A protein has these predicted regions:
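N-terminal TM1-TM2 helical hairpin plus the immediately adjacent luminal interfacial "cap"
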Residues: 2-109
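Alpha-helical transmembrane segments and their membrane-interface exit regions
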Residues: 114-117
Length: 117
């Protein structure tokens, strides 16, 4: 049986949350902070989805991804689903850094999940 991309993303993001609990410095290298992106740390536009503000934040992001992601993946296929996820994540990250003040730190996968609405 093939594993769905939705469940794979949920597994990876949830595992990253556990890594962050054990290694808090993980947050320092993955959270979205405009001054770091401006200095060339472009990976943060994507790694922001790996860190969350707490267990409740993680739960609601992953629950929403599960509820919305499964039907989208079933309808469009794994590849298109992943394209939507990562384009939405990038778009959400760019909106976050350009619509908030320079000292705002963003975390979570909400931008990617909102792309499925």
């Amino acid at each position: 049986m093939k594993r769905s991309a939705t469940l794979s993303l949920i597994t990876v993001i949830s595992a990253a949350y556990l890594v962050n609990l054990v290694y808090p410095a993980f947050y320092d290298y993955t959270a979205l902070f405009r001054p770091f992106v401006d200095s060339g740390e472009y990976w943060r536009l994507f790694t922001v989805a790996l860190v969350h503000g707490g267990l409740t934040h993680l739960f609601f992001n992953m629950f929403s991804l599960f509820v919305l992601g499964n039907p989208v993946e079933a309808a469009l296929g794994k590849a298109r689903f992943l394209v939507i996820f990562f384009i939405s994540l990038l778009t959400g990250s760019l909106a976050s850094i350009y619509l908030t003040n320079d000292l705002h730190v963003s975390v979570g996968a909400s931008g990617a999940v909102f792309g499925f609405y």
